[in-house]
Regions:
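Conserved loop->alpha-helix
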Residues: 1-219
Length: 219
C-alpha cells in the first residue's frame, strides 16, 4: 500500500527480457535506509518487488500483465521513473490510499505553463470516467494529485513547482503516456452496490444510496 507521495526519482540503468517479462535495474536519486530484500516499491505507480538492493540500486521483475497495462514497457534505458516505498503504519497519510495496481494508461493532451505551475490535460481512459471527479484524488505515474476539472473526454491537474522538481512530471510533454490509478474507495463502493449471488443474480446490497445518505456519505 502507498500514498502517492513520491520520495524521489530513479533512472533505468538496465532493461532486458527475463522469464517472459522484463528485468529492470533502477538507480534511485535518494538513499534507501534499512533496505529489505523483497520489499514492495512503486515504480511509476506500479507495485513491484525490489531485490538485489545495493546502495541506491535495485532490481525489479516486471510481469507481462504490468508491461501490457502500464507505461513501463515503453520506457527506455536512461528513462526517469517515480519511486515510493511501501507505507508503514507509523507514516503520515499525506496523499491518498494507493494500491500500486494501475488501471490504465492515457496520453498527455496538453502541457500549459501557468507561471511556476503547469496545468496538464489528459484523456479520460475508457470506462474510468465515472471514478474521476472534480477535486477528487487520482494517481498519475504514482503521484497523488487532485483533479482540477473533468468532463466526458478530458481531465486536468495543476502541478506545483515542488512536484515538478522532485518527480518525472517536470519532464513530461504532450504526447507522453502516463499510468493512471483511480480512487480505490470509489471502485469498492461501486462493487458493493452491484453485488451478485453465486448464480449471477443481482442481490440487494445493504450498502445502497439510502444507506450512504443516512450515514453522511451522500447529500
Amino acid at each position: 500500500m502507498f500514498t502517492g507521495i513520491i520520495l524521489g526519482k530513479g533512472r533505468i540503468l538496465e532493461k532486458r527480457p527475463a522469464g517472459g517479462g522484463m528485468l529492470f535495474a533502477v538507480q534511485a536519486d535518494f538513499d534507501l535506509p534499512e533496505p529489505e530484500e523483497g520489499e514492495s516499491i512503486a515504480v511509476n505507480g506500479v507495485c513491484l518487488t525490489a531485490r538485489e538492493i545495493s546502495g541506491r540500486r535495485f532490481v525489479v521483475d516486471v510481469s507481462p500483465e504490468s508491461l501490457n497495462r502500464t507505461n513501463l514497457g515503453k520506457l527506455a534505458t536512461g528513462g526517469l521513473v517515480n519511486l515510493e516505498r511501501a507505507l508503514r503504519l507509523s507514516d503520515r497519510l499525506g496523499g491518498h490510499i494507493v494500491s500500486g495496481h494501475v488501471d490504465a494508461t492515457t496520453p498527455v493532451l496538453e502541457r500549459k505553463p501557468l507561471g511556476d505551475f503547469v496545468l496538464f490535460t489528459f484523456a479520460v481512459p475508457e470506462d474510468l470516467g465515472k471514478y474521476i471527479i472534480e477535486k477528487g484524488s487520482i494517481t498519475i505515474d504514482g503521484i497523488s494529485l487532485t483533479v482540477n476539472s473533468v468532463d466526458a473526454r478530458t481531465f486536468s491537474v495543476s502541478i506545483i513547482p515542488h512536484t515538478l522538481q522532485v518527480t518525472s512530471l517536470g519532464a513530461l510533454q504532450q504526447g507522453d503516456t502516463v499510468n493512471i490509478e483511480v480512487d480505490l474507495i470509489g471502485k469498492y463502493v461501486e462493487k458493493l452496490l452491484s453485488v451478485k449471488s453465486n448464480d449471477g443474480e443481482k442481490k440487494e446490497s445493504k450498502i445502497n444510496p439510502a444507506f450512504l445518505a443516512e450515514h453522511g456519505f451522500l447529500k
